[in-house]
Every structure is written in C-alpha cells, then in structure tokens.
A protein has these predicted regions:
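Conserved ABC ATPase "signature" region
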Residues: 106, 110, 117-135
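Catalytic Walker B motif of ABC-type/P-loop ATPase nucleotide-binding domains
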Residues: 164-167
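Helical segment within the ABC ATPase nucleotide-binding domain
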Residues: 179-192
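A short, surface-exposed alpha-helical micro-motif characterized by mixed small hydrophobic
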Residues: 206-208
C-alpha cells in the first residue's frame, strides 16, 4: 500500500514513528500531521531527534517502528516516489564550491531527472527567484553563506516538489542573510503552495516564519500548536523561551557553526 487515507489538507502524516540506534531511542513513537501550505517548525535542543526525524521522512534513514506518509506516499512502501515529490536541504552546506551556481543547478536538475528541454529555463527561473542572477556564473566557493543557502533552496525547487524539508536552514548565517532566507521561504510557500517542514533552534525564526510548531524533547513530542497560542496558554506575557522551559525543563541549546560538509553533500546526493 503506497497511499495513506488522508484528507486533502494533510501533506505529512507520522504514525508512531520511531528510530533506535542500539539501546538509544532517538525518535520515540511520534505521531504528528503537517497540513498543506504550512511552514511547520520542529524545535528542540541538540539531540532532541529533529534531524533523525527529517532523515526518516526524506527516506534517508529507515524507521525502527511506525510509518509516515509524505504527499500521500508511504516512506516504507515507495521511498523512490517520496523522493520524487520532495525537496531537501541538509543542515550543512552541500553545494559544490568548485562549480558555479549555474553548474550546481544543472547537476541538481539532472539528479532530479528534470526533463532536458526544461532544464535551462527552470535554472534561469530558480536563479531569478532566489536573487542570484548576477552571481550565477561565479564559483560557489566565493559565495557568502546566505547566497549558498539560497542556491541550495534553488536546487531543491528545480523539480517542483510539493514538500520541502530543511534541516537548520539558517544556522551560522548573519541576521541579514537569515531574513533573506526567510523571505524566500515565504515566497515559495505563497507562489508555489509549497509545504515546508524545517528544524530549528531559533525562537526568532519560529516567531517570524512558522505557522505551527512542534517541540521535541528527548525524541518525544512535548507539545504542538500555533506559536502565539502556545505562549498564551502559559501566560499572557509568555515567550517561546517560556514555552520551551515549561515543556522541556530548560533553556534551548544553540548549535555551533559550519563543520566539514563532505558527508552532508554525500547525503544530499543520495536523494537522487
């Protein structure tokens, strides 16, 4: 069975989704729906299970138990079809610095089997959408971190996915670059009716970008809801930091900067 019984508003459905590594349970029987057209945030400290969950939903990591449906397709029964319907940007920068922006997009277009007669125009459109027209023929090693992130978003949208998965999309970026990425994500949701599921440590990112939020703690779903309503449920003056402390008993940990990207690039290549 490749199709789940979903109503038209649900694009991602997780049912008791679990992943173990030996005796350690990284994601513990998580059940959650994401509706069509949402920008949905997964918030949690390091080790909460956010990246493991994303890797299961993008079929890069099989679940130990449970099931999930993405764009109506089972991640267990038909992972190849899931990959055709989604875009994915890993946490660490995955673009090839020794290629130009345009060459990176051409590589991705081939990887995602974009029809040959459509590749040139889709690349032009994606570069324009991400405001990278003037940098298209420069080597990516000379791009800023924010430009690389926008290039990776362009790569992920080339095959017109219905769902976009982003793992810490603005980690390590300065405030101006972060807001540029947020603007592009809002435009992608508006212009293409795209559903976005992103992981984050950043409370400001959630407040500015996410329609709905799920907080993960030790691999379990602590709470889910609209960010402003979660705050009001704690107190009239509560912030998302207060919500996190209430459900998880501590302050969220911020992750560091970029590390070696080779493994993340190899992970991205396996999406093809």
């Amino acid at each position: 069975m490749t199709q789940s019984v979903l109503d038209d508003t649900v694009v991602i459905r997780m049912q008791q989704l679990t992943r173990r590594f030996g005796d350690f349970t990284a994601v513990d029987h998580l059940t959650l729906d994401v509706r069509r057209g949402q920008i949905f945030g997964l918030l949690g400290s390091n080790g909460a299970g956010k990246s493991t969950l994303i890797k299961m939903l993008t079929t890069l990591l099989p679940p130990s138990e449970g099931e999930a449906f993405v764009a109506g397709v089972s991640i267990l029964a038909n992972p190849a079809e899931v990959r055709r319907r989604i875009g994915y940007v890993p946490q660490m920068l995955s673009a090839d610095g020794m290629l130009t922006g345009r060459e990176n997009l051409l590589f991705s277009a081939r990887l995602y089997a974009v029809p040959a007669h459509e590749r040139k125009q889709r690349i032009v459109d994606a570069l324009h959408f991400m405001a990278l027209d003037e940098s298209a023929d420069k080597l990516v090693k000379n791009y800023s971190g924010g430009m690389i992130r926008r290039l990776e978003l362009a790569q992920a949208m080339l095959h017109h996915p219905s769902v976009l998965f982003l793992d810490e999309p603005t980690i390590g970026l300065d405030p101006l670059a972060r807001r540029a990425v947020w603007d592009r994500l809002r435009s992608m949701r508006r212009d293409f009716n795209m559903t976005v599921l992103l992981t984050t440590h950043d409370m400001e990112e959630v407040e500015n970008l996410c329609d709905e939020l799920a907080i993960l703690h030790s691999g379990r779903l602590a709470v889910t809801g609209i960010p402003s309503e979660l705050c009001k449920a704690i107190s009239p003056t509560a912030t998302l930091d207060d919500v996190f402390a209430h459900y998880c008993g501590g302050v969220i940990e911020q992750s560091g900067g970029f590390a070696d990207t080779r493994n993340e690039r190899n992970t991205a290549l396996r999406m093809g």
